[in-house]
Amino acid sequence: LPGLTGVWVGEDKICSMGIAVRRWVSWHGFALNIHPNFEHWALIHPCGLVGRHVTSVEKLSGHPVDMGDVKRSIAEKAGDVFCMEPASIDRAELFKIAEEAL
């Protein structure tokens, strides 16, 4: 939707995106709704947008979606965009890298 950040399917938001810069380090990310609990979403306004609703990959596809498949697909597509080969690291190593960046 014009003027609104994120990814929208019709009038419903399926993905939020954000960026921040602290101490010369950029932080960026997105939140893709795969199979959220919509009862929880009824209690908040997504990104402060009153009267807007969220949707999900599962709701739009009409069947359960495997989170592992989603993660692999996103990693593959991100690798294509950035001309990189996706690699896995454990959580401890990730936190170490993040701390060193601060």
Label each PLM-derived region with a short phrase:
Residues 1-102:
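Catalytic beta-strand/loop module used to bind and position nucleotide/cofactor moieties
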